[in-house]
Amino acid sequence: MFSVPAISEDRFVEYFEIQIAQSDTTVITGLVGSQIKDSVFIAKTLLKNNKQKFGLNEIKDFHIHFTNNDIFKDGPSASLGIFMAILYYQKYHTKMKLINSDFTFLVTGDVDLRGNVKEIGGLKEKRKFFRKENFSLFVIPKEGNEVLRYSDELSCDNIYDTLSIIEKRASHVEKI
């Protein structure tokens, strides 16, 4: 199982868990809206259509459960994080490999079917959380954010930029 934290009201919450599905379909459970569901299927489509670029032989169906059913989850800003989590899970789950590192990063952005990372709202709150929690890197959409405020904040146009940024900043993270 692979779990990913997220931000809610300036605190971490366990956001979702991913594991291989026992069926031949991707399953989404939890208290989520249509934008979150769309983000999961966009991520899966991008991975299926570009699996060789990501070093994947196949894309396994999975069950993704959005935890904390007392908190409704929706909005496009989680798209990039969902994509990254599904990519890492697809890449490493069969090897049972966990990346143990002091390098922690936060990503935010709305991902479309071409892999572009689009502008999102609430960036002020996300920056505040990033500073408070002392992450190593914060990756935000380039669209709408021409001025970066901190040296540990970088912007991206698409999912490939995001992966390149993370690989360059974290030399000890295995290449994707």
Outline where the language-model segments fall:
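Peripheral, non-AAA+ core regions of ATP-driven protein-machinery
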Residues: 1-176
